[in-house]
Amino acid sequence: MTLDLVLVCPGCRTRTPERLDVKTLERTGDLLVCECGRQYPIIDGVPIVFADPAEYLRGEIATIVERDLSPAVAALLVAAGPDDAPYPRLLEHLSIYLDAQWGDRAQPRADGAGFALEAVIARLAALPHVGAAVELGCSVGRVLAELAVHAEHVVGVDLQFGALRRARRLLDGERVAFARRISGRHYAPAEIEAGDRVVPAARRQIVCGDALDPPLIPAIYDRVVALNVLDSIARPRQLLAVLDGLCAPGGELILTSPFAWQSSVMHEHERFGGADPAADLAAILTTGDGLGARYQIEDSAELPWTLRRDARSVLSYRTHYVRARRT
């Protein structure tokens, strides 16, 4: 398998009871092209591949055409607000997740809570080497970098283009400057380098796409990862089915979630597990309910997960970790 072949056209993908038909995308300049005629843009090294790319582009054009501004200029642009405008929202999102994922490699280090992945990375570091790993919800790319330590090829999918631009640059070995939120719309400059977590482009692919409809060839990934995505997506049961569909025979799923269900994200009937969603998740995996296979739970734990919003505000979760083998 080469990474040139892992992206498929979601627009013409067809499924019947007997088979799934997919067409791979070929690169032509700054486009990925399908023989069906559909085309998908590659911007700053990141392909944007959705079944309806026009709808995504209309809603996210501000983050797609965003320039690399110095932290001082970026902070000045958002100072007047409002908070819910696209660029202030992007700047806040990047501040939170760059520190959460790369805070141990940031200069200066964040005051208070910063790096949030220590417990997860320790578990990933103990896993055996595999051929291919995929992460849905890869954000700014740190877990993708850790997966690459124990995988020949890694693929990351996320909906947030601004985060993926930073992931691509960090994994390429570039120094990324960002604005770290101090209070309200006030920011201070910081920067990150991946160091020994650089991942050569020949070994990885980053794509802007829908985790519920990823443009990926099914059933080829030995390690399938989705960290803190389950309760951040409209259809968590569908996400489990997608993860199962990507998993190769004998492969493993790695999931974390604090199960912080929100009505603004999903309908009430999409929630599962009542007072003990971790037990319900284990039951879904071990029985194969709604999936194409059953899974054996090989590891589970309750891990800390903190997100620094600014110098005075931290979101703290206890996230459930589970690693399960396809049987």
Residue spans of the language-model regions?
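Conserved Class I S-adenosyl-L-methionine
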Residues: 183-184, 266-300
